[in-house]
């Protein structure tokens, strides 16, 4: 999992703020769809990705 998180972080670092915001919104929408469908495991996986992107965006804004 750590390698995956690192790879996502590297990809997030290469994104613009607008790209990050768009990706975060898309992940959030998909996460909600998965939760409504009862697939909490897949939603949880997306949540982890979303948090990496959020952390990257917030770190830039400090």
Predicted segment positions?
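Short, charge/polar-rich alpha-helical segments
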Residues: 2-22
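Short, charge-rich amphipathic interface segments used for partner binding and complex assembly
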Residues: 22-62
């Amino acid at each position: 999992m750590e390698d995956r998180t690192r790879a996502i972080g590297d990809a997030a670092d290469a994104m613009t703020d607008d790209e990050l915001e768009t990706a975060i919104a898309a992940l959030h929408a998909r996460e909600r769809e998965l939760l409504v469908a009862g697939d909490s495991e897949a939603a949880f996986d997306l949540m982890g990705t979303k948090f990496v992107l959020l952390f990257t965006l917030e770190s830039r804004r400090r």
